[in-house]
Amino acid sequence: MKVLVIGSGGREHAIVEALARSEYHPKIYAVMGNANPGIRRRAEDYLLEKETNVPAIVQYAQDCNVDMAIIGPESPLAAGLADELELNGIPVVGPRKDAARIEFDKAWTREFMARNNIKGLPKFKVYDDYDDACRYLEDNPDVVVKPAGLTGGKGVKVMGEHMHTLEEAREYVKSVLEHDRVVIEERLKGEEVTIMAFVDGKHVAPMPTVQDHKRAYEDDQGPNTGGMGSYTDNIDLLPFMTLDDYNEGVAIMEQTVKAMEKDVGVPYKGVLYGQFMITRDGMKVVEFNARFGDPEAMNVLSLLKTDFVDICEAIVDGSLDKLKIEFERSATVCKYVVPAGYPDNPVKDAPLTVVEKPEYLVYYASVNERDGKVYTTSSRSLAIVGVADTIADAEILSEEGLSNVQGEFHCRHDIGKERLIRKRIEHMDAIRG
């Protein structure tokens, strides 16, 4: 069996490692924007190409005679890569463009949720006119402002965190409207969590809950990033969650998948990522993504017991309900190594020396490899994942991995530490009253 993986980040390295563990021993082919050393090591062959160059990728898939493709990032989904591969007879794990719109058009997603009475919808407005948006802001200052389109996780601004005055909010709205529609939503109070699920068009198979850390600096300070790291507990829940929270999130995702085929006429196949805020009034949808999260993929795929090839085939042929999907009952802590100065002024081409050991997992991301060393680019470099019986023990292993990375870099040491988790628990206790 031959499987093509599109993407060159930590998420795609985790996908490739999950394939490499399969008892089917698939031959792995890759299309990457940069030559990810972890993927390169596992691949029979690879193409260095923009992940949105649809004709080149389809041609490569045909030349390699692949049996299946797995699309990692959002941009090729938005470019319609899944549609073109399927048209050429190649089954895809990843939704077609009309279904992937749930990620790349936030305005459409909110309107889709409203049309289909999907639960967990915050109050929202969509504007393409600056004056109308400003009038709404004056009456509703406690908001979140986001562009309708893709922003790599960095375009969302929250009043009281990224913006502190109405003037700042107006300025941000103005800058968004220069190239996009703007979505203004009520600011939700609670804890953000990620629930991802395998989806075959009808059936939803959820994974353990993950919490990502978007802010660049310790104690949740600094600018937003693509995600500095994440953790899971040794059950499907996180320490501040209830089973009702989890079940409510999964039910919202099931409702969304059901509505997708009815509303859009295209079944949703691939991974659905639900980002939820646990509030006093239950689970609210912060956003949906049409693929694995990065870093969250590295947590859940490191725990996956069921053969990943079986899961991919079940997604493609609509038989997920016949497959029992199991995860190790362990905790994980993932910490990203990023270039010094990331995200605003990342130091490029800085050398990193990485010692890999069996005590922890290393997933490579946006680095280049020369002469046995890896070199930073402008994006996240590599992630270290600790897997253990408890979050505390997994965190110790991730720190051991970080101590074996030499060079100039930044990371968040506080992810998975007791103090930060305790803060989340106390925050949620206060919210629930």
From Swiss-Prot:
It comes from Methanocella arvoryzae (strain DSM 22066 / NBRC 105507 / MRE50). Mn(2+) 1 binds at residues 275, 287. Binds 2 magnesium or manganese ions per subunit. SMART domains: GARS_A, GARS_C. PROSITE patterns: ATP_GRASP (PS50975), GARS (PS00184). This is Phosphoribosylamine--glycine ligase. Its cofactor is Mg(2+); Mn(2+). GO terms for molecular function: ATP binding; metal ion binding; phosphoribosylamine-glycine ligase activity. Belongs to the GARS family. Keywords: ATP-binding, Ligase, Magnesium, Manganese, Metal-binding, Nucleotide-binding, Purine biosynthesis. Mn(2+) 2 binds at residues 287, 289. Mg(2+) 2 binds at residues 287, 289. Pathway: Purine metabolism; IMP biosynthesis via de novo pathway; N(1)-(5-phospho-D-ribosyl)glycinamide from 5-phospho-alpha-D-ribose 1-diphosphate: step 2/2. GO terms for biological process: 'de novo' IMP biosynthetic process; purine nucleobase biosynthetic process. ATP binds at residues 138-194. Its EC number is 6.3.4.13. The keyword Cytoplasm does not apply. It catalyses: 5-phospho-beta-D-ribosylamine + glycine + ATP = N(1)-(5-phospho-beta-D-ribosyl)glycinamide + ADP + phosphate + H(+). Gene3D superfamilies: 3.40.50.20, ATP-grasp fold, A domain, ATP-grasp fold, B domain, Phosphoribosylglycinamide synthetase, C-terminal domain. Mg(2+) 1 binds at residues 275, 287. Residues 111-317 form the ATP-grasp domain.
